[in-house]
């Protein structure tokens, strides 16, 4: 790998409602990424847990701060033990803040953390666009029942890979967000996700390649995959749920990938593998600059008409 190339790892996993088990998988994937000489590893949305319903999510979110602290400690341990630095981008949940509760808002926060090799959280981006949809011949989902939307566009991160713009899952459907991140200097965009089978099959690759071409950025797409076990006997007992009320399974699309600024897929998860998986790609900043120089979209934009 030459000096102009930076290696990225994109992880795919199948989260459950058990944060302890999920953390074990996350740590194993980070360890593998270090051993394969990645500079940054990107994990999917909801790497801490997936839940049965809004009440279950609020219950599990109380455990997320401990998950995050243990993850930070694990990163520093892995860096020390392997004598190699790595940064980590990971989608997790946070419980409502004290101010949220004072305002009568008990919904959780869906956030993307960027943690450096010293275990420091450099950025906490809260998902802007929430997945409230009635998919034709598919599920009816209303993320806003359990999640509060963010209120701010995240700053660009000066990562070992280059200038990184952060987004989460459904954000990818709003091109103005990606274009804004590009206008702020982004060279790389990440979209950690938990796409449904129906929407993933129809739009996952299409959206990723479109955002890469729109922005002339590398696009990183770590996804949840497979059938998730959302059973939680402890919570079900506490909440006195009947068997009919339980919703202990959901399925995610997977197909994690890395796309270059020309819209070419340069790394793709093995679709036959449902378990945890890591894909690698070497990002070439000279290629990015060449594409931007030969097709100077940002110089040709009609900012006098479009704002």
Swiss-Prot record:
Keyword Transit peptide: no
Enzyme class, spelled out: hydrolase
Coarse class of the protein's main subcellular location: cytoplasm
Places the protein is found: Cytoplasm; Mitochondrion
Binding-site list for substrate: 173, 199
Cellular component aspect of the GO annotation: mitochondrion
Transmembrane stretches, start-end: none
Active-site positions on this chain: 45, 127, 169
Domain of life according to the entry: Eukaryota
Catalyses which reaction(s): N-(4-oxoglutaryl)-L-cysteinylglycine + H2O = L-cysteinylglycine + 2-oxoglutarate; N-(4-carboxy-4-oxobutanoyl)-L-ethylglycylglycine + H2O = N-(2-aminobutanoyl)glycine + 2-oxoglutarate
Family: Belongs to the carbon-nitrogen hydrolase superfamily. NIT1/NIT2 family.
Quaternary structure annotation from Swiss-Prot or TrEMBL: Homodimer.
The protein's name in its UniProt record: Deaminated glutathione amidase
The organism of origin for this protein: Saccharomyces cerevisiae (strain ATCC 204508 / S288c) (Baker's yeast)
Lineage, broadest ranks: Eukaryota, Fungi, Dikarya, Ascomycota, Saccharomycotina
The gene coding this protein: NIT2
């Amino acid at each position: 790998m030459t000096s102009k190339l930076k290696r990225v790892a994109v992880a795919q996993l199948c989260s459950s409602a058990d944060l302890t088990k999920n953390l074990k998988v996350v740590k194993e994937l980070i360890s593998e990424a270090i051993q394969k000489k990645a500079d940054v590893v990107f994990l999917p949305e909801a790497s801490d847990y997936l839940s049965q319903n809004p009440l279950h999510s609020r219950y599990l979110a109380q455990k997320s701060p401990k998950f995050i602290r243990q993850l930070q400690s694990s990163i520093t341990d892995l860096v020390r033990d392997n004598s190699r630095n790595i940064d980590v981008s990971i989608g997790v949940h946070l419980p409502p803040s004290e101010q949220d509760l004072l305002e009568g808002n008990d919904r959780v926060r869906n956030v993307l953390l960027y943690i450096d090799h010293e275990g420091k959280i450099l950025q906490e981006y809260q998902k802007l666009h929430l997945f409230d949809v009635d998919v034709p011949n598919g599920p009816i989902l209303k993320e806003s029942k359990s999640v509060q939307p963010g209120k701010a566009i995240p700053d660009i991160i000066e990562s070992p890979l280059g200038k990184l713009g952060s987004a989460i899952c459904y954000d990818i459907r709003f091109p103005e967000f990606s274009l804004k991140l590009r206008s702020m200097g982004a060279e790389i965009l990440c979209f950690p996700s938990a796409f449904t089978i129906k929407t993933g099959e129809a739009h996952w690759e299409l959206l990723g390649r479109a955002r890469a071409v729109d922005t002339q950025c590398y696009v990183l797409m770590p996804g949840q995959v497979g059938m998730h076990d959302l059973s939680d006997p402890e919570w079900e007992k506490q909440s006195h749920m009947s068997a009919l009320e339980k919703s202990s399974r959901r399925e995610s699309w997977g197909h994690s990938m890395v796309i270059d600024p020309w819209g070419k897929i340069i790394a793709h998860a093995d679709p036959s593998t449902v378990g945890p998986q890591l894909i690698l790609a070497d990002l070439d900043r000279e290629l990015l600059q060449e594409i931007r120089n030969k097709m100077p979209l940002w110089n040709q934009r009609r900012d006098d008409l479009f704002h």
